[in-house]
């Protein structure tokens, strides 16, 4: 089995992150994608040599003032800290194949101790970084073993992996 931390490091290092107004599945069929509040989006082009070893997702947000209802619910009022935690929760929910509302009701903005055990997907790792005005969480679940490599996998964008 490939180590998730090594996979993630290689994908972030060797992949390409593209911000544009068009990040649809039609325009970027093999990229992990996330849409931003300003109408643009990010497409993360993971090198093809890595894609067969894991499921790669990302989530991104432009930090904004945190609504008072969210401050009360999650106890975070700093926009950057909230965006970091939110994108991490979104990315991990995508890997767990859960709608974000389900993730939030179960875990809030925290990471469960055994996040890789959320479903039978394998070892999981993530990294949250800032790119200009955007906070991005990259995440991967390493595939334990892949018997059939004849079909190309399309990474998740929404709540489905």
List each model region and its residues.
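Core catalytic alpha/beta fold that binds nucleotide/phospho-ligands
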Residues: 1-161
